[in-house]
Amino acid sequence: WRTMARSIDPQPKAARGFIPARTDEERYLMRHIEDLAHTAFSRDIARYSAFLSDREQDLARAALGRAGVQEGFRFEGGWLNAERRVLCIEPEYSCGEAPICCVRLQCRAQAGAALPAHKDYLGSLMGLELRREALGDIVLPEDQPGTAYVFALEPAAQLICRELFQAGHTELTTELLTLDEVPQFPQAEREMHSATVSSLRLDAVLAAMLHCSRGQASELIEAGRVEINHLPADKPHAQVYEGDVFTVRGKGRFNLTALPGKSRKDRSIIEFFQY
């Protein structure tokens, strides 16, 4: 990817601060995490949450801090680079194991047939009436075409093995794996992109990522089709920060990996990739 001319002086880095709970569901989650922590540390027993998104993990950390918990917890998603993860609260003398299993799904497609995509697997799993928090990541390794690995809470994993027979129009076989049996997945190769924008406003950055006009980007934002870090973003003028993850319904997800500084024409340089 093309390197752009940059200013000599690096720009001071701004960081997005923690955003407190904004909905009843988020406030309930924080109270639930505090209750788990109280039970775990008052009784010296391990306690585990359901799968949490990145945003929910931030809320969980805040809830633990509010409960005075500084250690004795971790987040586990079943594999190294997991996005969706379970909060494991494990006091020093407790015994426990994260209730995570993995189901390997293998397609029984004819040669040359189109293989299911991530959305096909997720749609089939939702068709089993599973709650999203019972499911972790769905990994489609590039070196294993036609194979997907679904991380799930143990009861959900058992249900998947009993009830899931196809994804989209493709028949599947299922196999329950322990986490020790899950192979190491190759690091996904991300195609990095670089662009310059007039400002670090959401509409300007989104327009660069989507190769559209700022007006079109603003329409997507105002239509409620854009999220930043799993939170709705409805203001085109909102400031963006390094590390932000943008979800645009119908367009994909993007990670703003770096804000290296200014170009010679005094425009902000952004670096990003699409998932």
Regions found by a protein language model. Name each.
Residues 199-250:
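Basic (Lys/Arg-enriched) interaction patch that binds polyanionic ligands
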Residues 1-203, 209, 232, 246, ...:
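Ferredoxin-like alpha/beta domains used as RNA- or RNAP-binding modules
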